[in-house]
Amino acid sequence: MAQVNDVRASIQVCMFDQYGTVVDMQTGLTEAAAPYLAAKGWKGDPNSFVTWWRRTHFENSMIDALLHREHTSYREIGHRSVAFVLERAGIPYTLDEVGDLVAHIERLRPFPEVPEALARLQRRYPLMVLSNVIPTCWKRRSGITEFRSTV
């Protein structure tokens, strides 16, 4: 037990990613995309659509980083990714529709256990988000009102 206590005593801050760690992206975005895709007459699986969206988003984020480009906002990469996936799936869209789908990211809910877990951690450690998070998403949905965000 001494080793565990030594490790706990050495922790100075807890850092984690926002998307997929704090908030349930797959479920939330699938719930948001399903009615849109159905209204467009798309017969595919909304969960697969969201997986393509998220994978494309990740790939675009990595390409920006690897090419040492200026920072591209999470929202902008989201717009590019959704438009690409809609195009790939043969779904006609408008830029407003793309914006509406991406805006759902700001309304994602945390995984059920997250608010209590963060509250417990925050009593003992400073919490940080190491992410290209949209700051309003963190404040609104995480249950934590004071945090430091590092991008």
Predicted regions and their residues:
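Substrate-recognition/cap helix-loop segment adjacent to the acidic, metal-dependent catalytic center
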Residues: 40, 91-95, 115-151
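N-terminal helical cap/lid subdomain that shapes the substrate entry/recognition surface
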Residues: 4-112, 134
